Amino acid sequence: MKLEFDPGLIEEVVFKAMKLKEESGDSAFLDEYHTFADPIYENHTPDERPAKFRKIEWDFFRKMGFYKAIEEIFLEFSGIDGLVAGGVVAKARSQFDEGSNLVKGPDLEPGKKKVVIKLLAERFHDNVFLKKLIRHELMHVVDMLTASFGYKDERLGLNPMEESIIKERYSTIWDIYVDSRLISQGKETVIDKEGRYLEFAALYHGFPSDVN
């Protein structure tokens, strides 16, 4: 599957990673970056510079292993390749904006959508959690693409508040369903069983404890 990345996300991930390494006493990546980036100011016009900087940032994104980490998890889900028109990893505005979706585009084949996963830049600085999170979101995508799952992207409530409550409760049950399958496959989940129980209990506190 062809993967696309939000340039803004790449920039933030790369610079945060270089800063963290520098703070730990390793300035090798930052020094190397400047050897490529500094000459751009002398050799290119202001209009040309953004594209040049994006190319360097993309090269470092790959060199620092971020692209490979994402690609490895997408390869685990090669079965959806023929069902979608590619994947996009975009920058999330907040933790509440993180997640996955299937998105139509004017330049796509009829009936085909792109997988869009939104992430915070900070997720890339914990490689183990990043992979678990991507895998979790791609499990959601598989469900969206499975006819028997019955996923529908439609309004769920009569007003914004009601819709928010319904979505939050439904999402928790869906996450539990995803976790159960990952565990059966011997994969780690983004939240452990106790954490999911606390989430569920908080949202369904009106139910008797024996039902929970």
Model-derived segments and spans:
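Auxiliary, metal-adjacent structural segments of Zn-dependent hydrolase domains
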Residues: K2, D6-K114, Q185-G186
